[in-house]
Amino acid sequence: MRIPLLAPDNYAFPDPAYALARCDGLVGVSRDLDAGRLLEAYRNGVFPWFLRDGWFFWYAVGPRAVIVPERLHVPRSLEKTLRNCSYRVTVNGCFAEVVAHCAAAVRPNQDGTWIAPEFQTAYLKLHEMGYAHSFECHYPDENGKTRLAGGFYGVQIGRVFYGESMFALQPDASKIAFACAVPFLASLGVELIDCQQDTGHMRRFGSELLPFADFAERLRMLNAVPLKEEIGRREVACKGL
C-alpha cells in the first residue's frame, strides 16, 4: 500500500473518503506537527494518531463517534457522585499539566503513550493560540487543599469540540470533568463533540455514530460559526446535574 506523504509547505489533506474506502483510515504521514496542519486536520475530520520513526501518522475514523450536547447521558452512578462529592471543575486552569498527565496515564492494551513530547509541544501551541482547552477536576486532600484529580483536553474550532485524551488520578475524576464540561460548552454554543472512536466509555455518556460523510458535512457547517462567548479560564458549574 502506498502511503500518501504530506508536503511540508502545504497543509491540505487528501480526501479522507479514500482512506476510509481502504478500511484502514490512514490519510497520510508527515514530518511535521505544525499548528496550521493540526487545525486543517481537525477541520477535515482527521487527527494525528501516533509518531513512528520520525513520521506523524494522520487518520480518519468512520463511522464517527460524537456526542450532541443536548443528548448527553450522565450514568446514574455518576449522578450520585456528582451530588455527593466535594469537587471543583475548572477550564484552562493547568493545560500543560493535564496534557502531561494524559501522556503518563497507563491504558489497557497499550505499550506506551501516543502523546510524545512533540505532541505535547504542538497542543500547548494550540492552547496559546486559543484553540486547545483543558478541563480539570479538583478534589480536596487530607488538609482540605484542592488538588488536580483528573481531567481531559481537546481542540475547539467554531462550534465543534474535538476531544483528545483523559486521565484520572482518583476514581471518576475525568468523568466528573466531562459531565460538567459538556453543558458548559453547550452554553457557549458548542453543538458537536467529536469522540473520534466508538468506545464503551463514551457510549455511557450517550455517544452516537455518524457516517463519515455526514460528520464531515457537519464540520463544514459548524467550524465556520463562532462561539457565543470565548471559553476562557474559569470555574465550571455542573448545571442541571
Swiss-Prot record:
Keywords: Acyltransferase, Cytoplasm, Transferase. GO terms for cellular component: cytoplasm. The keyword Transmembrane does not apply. It catalyses: N-terminal L-lysyl-[protein] + L-leucyl-tRNA(Leu) = N-terminal L-leucyl-L-lysyl-[protein] + tRNA(Leu) + H(+); N-terminal L-arginyl-[protein] + L-leucyl-tRNA(Leu) = N-terminal L-leucyl-L-arginyl-[protein] + tRNA(Leu) + H(+); L-phenylalanyl-tRNA(Phe) + an N-terminal L-alpha-aminoacyl-[protein] = an N-terminal L-phenylalanyl-L-alpha-aminoacyl-[protein] + tRNA(Phe). Pfam families: Leu_Phe_trans. It is found in: Cytoplasm. Gene3D superfamilies: Leucyl/phenylalanyl-tRNA-protein transferase, C-terminal domain (3.40.630.70), Leucyl/phenylalanyl-tRNA-protein transferase, N-terminal domain (3.30.70.3550). It is an enzyme of class 2 (transferase). One of its GO terms (molecular function) is leucyl-tRNA--protein transferase activity. InterPro entries: Acyl_CoA_acyltransferase (IPR016181), Leu/Phe-tRNA_Trfase (IPR004616), Leu/Phe-tRNA_Trfase_C (IPR042203), Leu/Phe-tRNA_Trfase_N (IPR042221). Its EC number is 2.3.2.6. One of its GO terms (biological process) is protein catabolic process. Functions in the N-end rule pathway of protein degradation where it conjugates Leu, Phe and, less efficiently, Met from aminoacyl-tRNAs to the N-termini of proteins containing an N-terminal arginine or lysine. Belongs to the L/F-transferase family. This is Leucyl/phenylalanyl-tRNA--protein transferase. The lineage of its organism: Bacteria, Pseudomonadati, Pseudomonadota, Betaproteobacteria, Neisseriales.
